[in-house]
């Protein structure tokens, strides 16, 4: 019977849980506000993990907040190395997840079209 999820999918899910826990308890960076890990995309060869995050109440501009978060990547890899059963922990790259903003923009466009009677 084939597996339902690939290894990279399982690693992504576990990394998402572990990274969220680390960001909640393992860093002291109040300027980032509340950081939410929305997704982790791990490459097929498990060499790179792209961590998508959102910020609530951040005092920094988005790019600066992502850069600041990247400063914690080496420490995070060490923590993941202790918590996960993997020979090699993927390189961690943070990226801002703008899907919520894009969704809100699409909603505004649809509402304006509907209001104008174009829909």
UniProtKB/Swiss-Prot annotation:
Entry GO terms, CC: cytosol
Cellular compartments annotated: Cytoplasm
One Gene Ontology term of the molecular function aspect: ribosomal small subunit binding
PROSITE patterns: RBFA
Top-level taxon in the UniProt lineage: Bacteria
Subunit structure: Monomer. Binds 30S ribosomal subunits, but not 50S ribosomal subunits or 70S ribosomes.
Family designation: Belongs to the RbfA family.
PANTHER family, sorted: RIBOSOME-BINDING FACTOR A, CHLOROPLASTIC-RELATED
HAMAP family, per the entry: RbfA (MF_00003)
Reported function: One of several proteins that assist in the late maturation steps of the functional core of the 30S ribosomal subunit. Associates with free 30S ribosomal subunits (but not with 30S subunits that are part of 70S ribosomes or polysomes). Required for efficient processing of 16S rRNA. May interact with the 5'-terminal helix region of 16S rRNA.
Name listed for the protein in its UniProt record: Ribosome-binding factor A
